[in-house]
Structures are given as C-alpha cells and as structure tokens.
Regions:
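Helical element adjacent to the flavin cofactor pocket in flavoenzyme catalytic cores
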Residues: 161-227
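N-terminal glycine-rich phosphate/pyrophosphate-binding loop and immediately adjacent elements
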Residues: 1-101, 249-256, 260
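FAD cofactor-binding and catalytic pocket of flavoenzymes
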Residues: 63-68, 72-73, 78, 85-87, ...
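Glycine-rich loop(s) and the adjacent beta-strand/alpha-helix scaffold that form part
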Residues: 20, 27-29, 33-43, 196, ...
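Residue-level detector of alpha-helix initiation sites
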Residues: 11-12, 236, 402
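A glycine-rich dinucleotide-binding beta-alpha-beta segment and adjacent secondary-structure elements
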Residues: 158-169, 189, 194-195, 344-406, ...
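Rossmann-like flavin
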Residues: 84-162
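Conserved acidic residues
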Residues: 3-4, 227, 393
Length: 428
C-alpha cells in the first residue's frame, strides 16, 4: 500500500510536488478555491461601462473573476490567485530562471531547470504575432540601449488568439498552467486549511473547513492524516497555516511590486496583445509591455479608449520587509524601493517619449503586487535538505515562502524547480 501525502495548494509549488510524488504516494491536493474558470466577457464591452462610475473599487474584480483575490492596502494592492492552478492561471505565463538568491546560499537547481525546459511548452517563438506597436516598442528600446529580449513563455503560440486575457485566464488553454500537472490526482476544492496538528516531532493531522461552492454558507469540518504533508498555499497563505500550527515565520515579506507607466497612442491596440512579450533587465527591476487591467478599470487616469493607449510595466525587487497575518498584508516600500521605482518610471518615460509620446501626456497606474514570499527563507544550512529546522521531519514547505530574497522577476519556473527537488528528497 502506498504511503499518503497531502499537498496544500495547487499552484506552481503544490501542483509540481503532487505530480512528482504521485508515482510513489497516494496524493491528495487540498485547494482553498474552486475549479478555475477564465474571464469570458469581452473587455471592450466592459470598458464602455467605466464612465458610469460602476467600477469604483478594485476588490469588485473578485465578483467577475472569483479566482482573483484582492487585498487592498493604503500604499498598494495585493493580487493573488485562489482556485485550482493557483496564481499560475492568472500569471502571464513567463518562464524565467530566477534562482540567483538560491545560488548564493549553495542551492544548485540546474538539473531541475533543464528538466522543466524539456517537459514544458517553453518558447520565445511568439514574435511573429507581435503587433506593430509591440514591434515599435521593442525597436525603440533597442535603439536606446535597454537590451530588450523576447520573454520565454509557457505557451503554445499556434493556439493563442491574442485576446489580451493572459492575466484573467487563457480561454483557449494556449497558456500552460499547473492544472495540466494534476490529471489523475485527487484534488479537493473549497478546502481551507486552518491548522496542522503537530506532536512528537511529527505533523499528524490537517484540519480543514470545506465549502461545496464559492457561495455556499455551509461549512464542513474535516480532518485528514498523512505520512507526508506539504504546505504550498503560496507566500500569502502558507505563513497563516504555519503560525496557526505553532510554527513561527519571519517578517521577511517581499511582493515584487508592479507599477505601470502609460500614455495615449492612437490605434495601439495593446489590449489585443500577448502580455509581457519581451523584457529589459535593469538593476533590481525589469521593464516590459503590459496592459494593466486593474488600473484600466479602476484608476480614473486610465479612462482612455481601450485601443488607444500603450503601457509599460516596472516590476521591482523590493526590500524583504513586511508581514502577512490572517490574509492581510502589512507592507510598506522602503526609501530604497521608492528610489529604484522612480528610476524605473524615468526609464519608461524616456522610452514612451522615444515612441513619440508627449511628456505631459504620460500617467501612472495603480501600485500593485502579486509575488509574495520570503517568510520562511532557506539558508545555507538547509541547502541540501530544503527543509527548515522549524518544521517537523514529515512537514515541508514548497512555495515562494522559501525564497531568501525578492526576485523582481516572474517566479513560477523557479518555484517549480524547487518543488521538483523537494519531491525528490521526500521520495528518496
């Protein structure tokens, strides 16, 4: 009889760990959200309703897309996924190796990254689909010395219809996400894990509050036992589960803040483009074309025609300082973060003006973030085991909580590489 494994979370870390363990363990995945459904309404139709004032708070997006969760803070908005596939269903499908911080503490994931590049549909063969505006942006950035490079994508380009829905769920499944790793695995949805019982140096029992549907008022309490328990509820969910189970976490939160810089541009049609088609690597931030739907619908400065604006994203590697408690973020950018962000804004202004935009027409988006992590960071002492001494022997963490420093880069591939290694350690 196979041993039992419980995996809490179905995002990049949880789904990959479950997939890797399924041959040797009887795996059950517990997902707090429900089955993912992509946003299906035409964005052009929703755009016509903006001036009515109906869209007055970013949290309203949860009504249209239940898998997208919003934590609104004074300085920024936290966006994360809750549903089968985790945040991978809402990410733009970027496949970037971002393990510099792990290398510094002696963790080499070359083997795992090589496997991922062989196993997954990772490609840069999407340039032929770029719009004239995307091509122009790329050329201007090349001429200005920003060294833009096509973004590796988890993508099947021949299935992509350039609908611009990448961050709201791909309607054609052209974009790969971790739901594809879960075929044949028992996934229990609507299962919010409240705590894990720990005794005699072992994780013994998982306590769950299960809802049959998103709108259900009835909750069932469940208790499950397993030989191995993996917490992969994301950098936002994992700290709460660990603390409720008596395991402390560090106030070491990073979130990779995002700020978009935009301007009017006739017939730009950026809403019908692949999001983040290429990237410029800067010092502690990146720049990439990105239609910021959160700002478009809820930031009044963005009340421009949907096909008549161009937007550049700054994604920042922020200082690891902050906390999450009961699904609520405490996070402020430091003076150094603001300094780097302002340099990014300056770069974007120069690029847009290089494309013919007038400086006075440039406006900023809403500061938001979607890559929380770092609250149970690995150190050199755990380079071989990838297992914190704060955890019982049979309890592992397998998400961005383990990352020792902010990335300022898309984290999905790196989290999956970590998950592969952790699953191997468990199996051996």
């Amino acid at each position: 009889m196979k041993k039992k494994a419980i995996v809490i979370g179905s995002g990049a870390g949880g789904a990959m760990a479950a997939h890797m363990l399924a041959s040797k363990f009887d795996v059950t995945v517990l997902e707090a959200g429900q089955a993912f459904k992509p946003f299906s309404l035409p964005l052009e139709q929703l755009a016509k309703v903006r001036k009515t004032g109906l869209y007055f708070d970013e949290r309203m997006i949860q009504m249209l897309l239940p898998s997208m969760r919003i934590d609104k803070q004074r300085e920024m908005i936290m966006v994360y996924g809750r549903g089968v596939g985790g945040t991978t269903t809402l990410a733009t499908g970027n496949a970037v190796r971002a393990d510099e911080g792990l290398k510094k503490i002696g963790i080499n994931l070359d083997e795992e990254f090589n496997e991922l590049f062989q196993e997954l549909p990772i490609t840069t063969d999407h340039q032929r689909y770029w719009s004239p505006t995307t091509k122009k942006t790329f050329e201007v950035m090349q001429q200005m010395g920003f060294d833009p490079q096509p973004m590796p994508k988890l993508l099947r380009p021949n299935k992509c219809r350039m609908c611009g829905h990448c961050s709201m769920g791909c309607p054609t499944r052209a974009k790969w996400d971790t739901r594809e790793l879960l075929d044949g695995i028992n996934v229990m949805t609507g299962c919010k894990v409240t705590r894990i019982d720990i005794g005699d140096g072992k994780a013994k029992r998982v306590h769950i509050e299960q809802k049959s549907s998103l709108l259900s008022l009835h909750t069932t309490h469940l208790e499950l036992e397993a030989d191995i328990i993996i917490v992969a509820a994301g950098g936002y969910g994992t700290p709460d589960i660990l603390r409720a189970s008596g395991i402390d976490c560090e106030p070491h939160l990073f979130v990779d803040p995002v700020l978009c810089v935009a301007a009017p541009m006739a017939n730009a049609r950026q809403q019908r483009q692949l999001l983040m088609p290429f990237v410029s690597m800067r010092d502690k931030y990146i720049i990439s074309p990105y239609m910021d739907w959160l700002s478009f619908f809820f930031n009044h400065q963005w009340y421009k025609p949907i096909d008549g604006m161009v937007s550049l994203m700054i994604k920042l590697a922020d200082v690891e300082q902050g906390d999450v408690h009961r699904n609520h973020m405490t996070k402020q950018l430091t003076p150094l973060d603001h300094q780097r962000l302002q340099q990014g804004v300056k770069d974007c202004r120069e690029i847009l003006m290089g494309m013919g935009v007038k400086e006075q027409d440039i406006f900023l988006g809403t500061l938001n973030a979607g890559h929380p992590g770092g609250m149970l960071p690995l150190s050199e002492a755990e380079a071989e085991t990838l297992h914190s001494p704060l955890l019982p022997d049979n309890l592992y963490v397998c998400d961005a909580s383990l990352l020792p420093q902010s990335l300022g880069l898309p984290p999905i591939l790196t989290i999956m590489a970590l998950a592969k290694r952790i699953a191997r350690i468990i199996s051996e």
